[in-house]
Amino acid sequence: MNYYDALYPQLVAMGQERWAAQLQSTLSKQLLLERYGDMPEWLSALEALPQIQPSCIDLQDSVTIGSGSDLGRISSEELITLLQAFHPWRKGPYSLFGVEIETEWRSDWKWDRLLPHIQPLAGRRVLDVGCGNGYHGWRMRGVGADFVLGIEPFLVSVMQFQVMQRYLRDPQHQVIPIGVEDLPANLACFDSVFSMGVLYHRRSPLDHILELKGCLRPGGQLILETLIVEGDQETVFMPPGRYAKMRNVWFLPSIPAMTLWLQRCGFTEIACVNTNRTSHGEQHATDWMRFESLADYLDPDDESKTIEGHPAPLRAIFIATRP
């Protein structure tokens, strides 16, 4: 089975014939099997999932697929065992045939914070960079996005997307295992581009912003969420080592500095529409994500600081327009 057969016609319809042909090669099942050692186990777990038609679907207020009564002879414990093969579940939550997948992040909280501030997604073609398992993409489809393409380099997250896709069977939402650096330059074909929780992992944040800009059509909107620090236009924090135990955190700008970066990259209509300090309610370890989480990243005696003594995670959502 090729999980991406429905993707290529979508790209061709967007004028991206060359990219579609390239992806047909890079996303071949054989190549993915060679690249990822856990791929056979995930494929087996995916194929072992029960073939059930969900009696109900809600993507507008949550991501809810079916109800417990749809399971029939299959027990919820059996389904949980199959789903746990895709541990760790970081983005969600999901409700799948009555099984509540309590993920590390309450991604629905971020969605609720940003939705009132962005251009309506109905009828739009959307790119979601670093999309994880596609949770926000399902919510985008729930509010009427015409097509959502998520890119995510971590294959376990892509396989979690395929779990949901097995039951939703939505050709208008695709998640592919590539990074932003693998995107062709200057696609200029998406109406909205999301980059949430990616910028601070990039060694060159301005190059990342320009890559995102190149994906947008003129008049398209960028929605960018990143870690920030307090300060003026000249304030940018670069951790001397780890930040919240993460080794790959590079630049945390202030709101004025981030605004300046977007201006220098050629964006207009720039606004910071939300700031939020990450709480234990929003990010925590669960039975579905049993590794360390926020509680382990903060100073136990002073939660305004990370374990290294840096300012605790503060996130901001920016919107901007490609002229």
UniProtKB/Swiss-Prot annotation:
Residues recorded as binding carboxy-S-adenosyl-L-methionine, renumbered to this chain, are 91, 105, 110, 130, 180-181, 196, 200, 315
Q: If you read the UniProt record, what top EC class would you report for this enzyme, in one word?
A: transferase
* Pfam families linked: Methyltransf_9
Q: Which molecular function GO terms apply here?
A: methyltransferase activity; transferase activity, transferring alkyl or aryl (other than methyl) groups
Instruction: List the transmembrane segments.
Output: none
Which keywords describe this protein according to UniProt? Transferase, tRNA processing
Name the Gene Ontology biological process terms: tRNA wobble uridine modification
The family assignment reads: Belongs to the class I-like SAM-binding methyltransferase superfamily. CmoB family.
Subunit: Homotetramer.
Q: What is this protein called?
A: tRNA U34 carboxymethyltransferase
Annotated organism of origin: Trichlorobacter lovleyi (strain ATCC BAA-1151 / DSM 17278 / SZ) (Geobacter lovleyi)
Which gene produces this protein?
cmoB
